[in-house]
Curated annotation (Swiss-Prot):
InterPro entries: Mediator_Med19_met. The gene is med19. Component of the Mediator complex. One of its GO terms (molecular function) is transcription coregulator activity. It comes from the Eukaryota. This is Mediator of RNA polymerase II transcription subunit 19. Residues 170-181, 212-224 have a biased composition (Basic residues).
């Protein structure tokens, strides 16, 4: 019993430099004898600093961590739920999505003659009634011309006003830029001195002998090349 009690006795903290007593066991038998072990020399103990103690206390306990957020909770909304009814949007849905089309059929088909907005069954003016019950006539059918096709109607009569205006081509606008009328400054009145100066210049040009000679030479050249000149005709006959 002494041997078993020695195993479960709490060991006292060992003091550095002292001998430690370790129980030994051989096989299935335990002996209460103690062996003295030689102390192992180690580094001198260092006292923990206050900063290291504070850091260790601040550090969280090491453990496993994951990079996943928390999964969303279960919600009552599923694909089978009508969201318009769920959020009470029936009024706004009927306001924006349930509008009646105010545009008439004639707005989409303006080239068709006649009143196409009203059905043609009351007065038998529909195309189906014309096919099912063709009119009885003795004359053969003749192809309609282009002018007649434009005004073709099932009932004889004038075209409605809305169709008359369709075939009238509006006048084309002329893309001419409006010329801006520049304000012309009134010319200053001529003084008698200016008019006298211009007259003097004209007289000087006319009196210049060189200008007179040039004019005479030009007249001579013109008269030589003209067919009425007698010298030109004699020279041409001599060459022949």
């Amino acid at each position: 019993m002494d041997g078993f009690s020695a195993l479960f006795v709490p060991s006292e903290p060992s003091v550095p430099g002292s001998q430690s007593v370790v129980p030994t066991c051989t096989g299935a038998f335990v002996s209460g004898k103690t062996q003295a072990q030689t102390p192992i020399p180690g580094p001198p103990p260092t006292l923990p600093s206050s900063s290291s103690v504070e850091d260790n206390s601040r550090r969280p306990a090491a453990g496993p961590f994951y990079l996943l957020r928390e999964l969303p909770g279960l919600s009552d909304l599923t694909a089978s739920i009508n969201l318009i009814l769920h959020y009470n949007l029936e009024h706004s849905f009927s306001k924006f999505c349930g509008k009646k089309v105010k545009e008439k059929l004639s707005n989409f088909l303006p080239d068709l003659p006649g009143m196409i907005d009203t059905p043609g069954t009351p007065d038998n003016s529909s195309l189906r009634s014309l096919i099912e019950k063709p009119p009885i006539c003795g004359n053969a059918f003749t192809p309609l011309t282009g002018a007649l096709l434009t005004g073709f109607r099932l009932h004889t009569g004038p075209l409605p006003e809305q169709c008359r205006l369709m075939h009238i081509q509006p006048p084309k606008k002329k893309n001419k830029k409006h010329k801006q009328s520049r304000t012309q400054e009134p010319a200053p009145p001529e003084t008698p001195s200016d008019s006298d100066h211009r007259k003097k210049k004209k007289k000087q040009r006319e009196d210049d002998p060189e200008r007179r000679k040039k004019k005479k030479d030009k007249k001579k050249k013109k008269s030589r090349h003209s067919p009425e000149h007698p010298g030109a005709g004699s020279s041409q006959s001599g060459l022949r």
